[in-house]
A protein has these predicted regions:
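Substrate-binding cleft of extracellular glycoside hydrolase catalytic domains
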Residues: 8, 12-147, 172
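Histidine- and/or cysteine-centered catalytic micro-motif in compact active-site loops
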Residues: 90, 120, 153-155, 180
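Short catalytic/ligand-binding loop motif for oxyanion handling, primarily in non-cytosolic enzymes
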Residues: 125, 157-160, 186
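Glycine-rich, charge-decorated loop segments at or immediately adjacent to ligand/cofactor-binding or catalytic sites
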Residues: 96-101, 156-168
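Functionally critical loop-and-helix segments that line ligand-binding/catalytic clefts
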Residues: 2-41, 45-47, 51, 166-241
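A short secondary-structure junction signal
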Residues: 128-129, 159-164, 209-210
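Active-site-proximal helix/loop segments of hydrolytic enzymes
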Residues: 142, 153, 167
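Aromatic-lined carbohydrate-recognition surfaces of secreted/lumenal glycan-active proteins
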Residues: 145-159
């Protein structure tokens, strides 16, 4: 169980059967909001600071063998402002170890950094496939002692379930689940029994600033928004698992 603080009251919330976890959990004041951005997303840090529920920022560090131009400067800004900081690699086709080395060299000391591997479409020719994802994950683990979180949408999760049932590597990861709905009608249990973070809003399901499922001040409709079903303390404790 993970405690959740809701208006000053600590309530035990069982995982993964609690229906509230899968139905607009961002509407509960005790849950936490995390944005994830890349160089194309604008952030007004002063405005964003007016929302105390936004506690973390995950930023694209690398895509294939290219670095995000705003990663390093935003890493400094976010951490100076007290946000939990994270980095993700968007996996492309090509040697996964070379990509993993580039990702680690870009983020620097990973001690306090949430790390994730973004698997957008494992069946597309230009994207990282599941076999190479496993190599990437294992390399990062060997170098850091920590297994990255896996970002995947519903289709990719199902593909991983089919290909990696019982796999030791994927069993050590947590899921950053992309599904742009207000309620999840059926979580695809398999490798993962539940999500760690749920990305529920982006330009895919929000086309007008201020009219998203959740609106983070200082950002536009195209900002990716995620929810953590638990307290700020719980998220901080699990951030660099």
């Amino acid at each position: 169980m993970t405690p959740i603080t809701d208006e000053g009251t600590t309530v035990a919330l069982p995982f993964p059967t609690d229906a509230q976890k899968y139905s607009s959990p961002w509407k509960r004041t005790g849950t936490q909001i995390v944005i994830d951005a890349y160089e194309g997303n604008a952030i007004n840090w002063t405005q964003m600071a007016t929302d105390p529920r936004v506690v973390g920022v995950i930023h694209r560090a690398t895509i294939g063998l290219q670095a995000d131009t705003l990663y390093k400067s935003r890493a400094v800004t976010a951490q100076q402002r007290g946000y939990l900081w994270g980095a993700y690699h968007l996996g492309k086709s090509g040697d996964p170890i070379t990509q993993a080395k580039f990702f680690l060299s870009t983020i620097g000391d990973p001690t306090n950094i949430f790390m994730a591997l973004d698997l957008e479409d494992t069946s597309a020719s230009g994207m990282m496939n599941i076999a190479n994802a496993k190599i990437f994950l294992n390399y990062v683990f060997q170098q850091t002692g920590r297994m990255p979180v896996v970002y995947a949408n519903n289709t990719v999760v199902k593909a991983i379930n089919a290909a990696m049932k019982g796999d030791v590597t994927f069993a050590q990861t947590q899921l950053w689940y992309a599904r742009f709905v207000s309620a999840i009608p059926g979580f695809p249990s398999g490798v993962w029994s539940t999500y760690y973070l749920w990305q529920f809003s982006s330009e895919i399901n929000c086309t007008s600033t201020g009219h998203c499922l959740y609106n983070v001040p200082g950002t536009s409709f195209d900002m990716d928004i995620n929810v953590f079903y638990g307290s700020k303390a719980a998220l901080a404790a699990e951030w660099v698992h």
